[in-house]
Every structure is written in structure tokens, then in C-alpha cells.
């Protein structure tokens, strides 16, 4: 049997819920958008913010952008490893679809580079047990244009306890002279396209012919397909996008040589 509600709460709540439903739906929608992640694992709301920040026509302050990114509770590692590469990839895709012109992409890449420098200044380095800080040379050969990716790798290597030097668009002879002078423990060559593999082959052969023992040589970049076949063709020790893999390979070889 139905009972009277002397306080009229049923009617009041029903009316109030009717007014609140659109607001609640909007809040839920916004929260869902904030939780949306890209295939890389990056949160969409952060990617959208950073893309706007580097693409805006107004001035860009990497310090202020870093503060904003930290407001999203991001670690320095996540900013370097995930968000800067993700936004760089998005800009490349937008250029291919004519949603962003070349000049804007260039400016955006330079801004990401300055943000990377700002983030790298706050990096904490790890100490590799049992060895002095390994020295790594990151090489972007002539004809390659993806300097930002190499800078990200350099930052990751520094975080892993390495001393790092960058070789940007140097001729093969300059690279060889640098290797002879610096004696790096590992060399990371960046290659974005198959047409650049021949340059990698020449550089690897030259380095191995003049340095004994040869440093660990790794190949990274936008490599797809038969990675083991690429490794054999180029003569590198490993093909990987992970700086951690290269350092791990070096450490294993270093320990094996020390025992021998």
C-alpha cells in the first residue's frame, strides 16, 4: 500500500535529478575523454594539450609547459619516453594529411626539442654497478632528418648512467674519426627509412675495420619487418628501439669479457 510522503522528497528528488542528468552526463563524458589513451599508452588529454602548446602561434615557454605537464601527475621519464615522441608522431601524421604545414611541424619539433632539454635537466642518473659510466655515441647519418628521436634516445641513455655524445649529419669519415678519438663503448645508429640502410652498412664496416675491439653497434629508428635480416645485412649487433636493450647488451658483453 502506497504511503504519503509528508516531506515531498520523492517529487523533489525526481525534479532535481531531471535537472542534474545533463550535467552528470557531461561530467562523465569529460572524465571518460580524460581517461582515453592512445595505442602508445599516452593519455589523450595530455597529448592534446601538448600538441596545442607546440603548435600555437603564440610564444612557447618550456618551463611553463613542464609545470603544466607535471600538473597531470606525469613523471619526467613519461614525458621524455612517451609524450614527446607521441606528439612528434602526431605532427608527422598531420603533415602527411596536410593538417599541418611543414613550417609548423618544424617549429613544433624545435619546441619539443627545447621541452626535452628542460625535462632532461631534471633527470636522475643511475649508477651502473661494477663499471665506470659507459660512453655512448648516437649517430644520425647524412640524409636523415629525425633529430628529435636521437635526442630522446640520448636523454634515455643519460638516465641509464651513460655519458653521451651526438653525431648529427656527419660524413662517414667524420664519424670514423670521432669513433677513433672518443673510443665509445656503444654506438647507436638511427635510420628512419630503408634507403638509409646502405649508409649504415658502410659506416659499420668502416668502424669495425679501424677499431678493435669494436664497440657495441645498435640500429634504431622506424625499422619494421625482418629485424634479424636487417641486423645481418647491416652488420650491427642488435636492432632495437630501446636504449635499455643496448645498455643491457653492452653490460652482458662487458661482464663476459671481464671474466675471460
Language-model segments: residues:
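Long amphipathic alpha-helical segments
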Residues: 1-124
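Peripheral docking tails and interdomain loops at the edges
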Residues: 223, 227-260
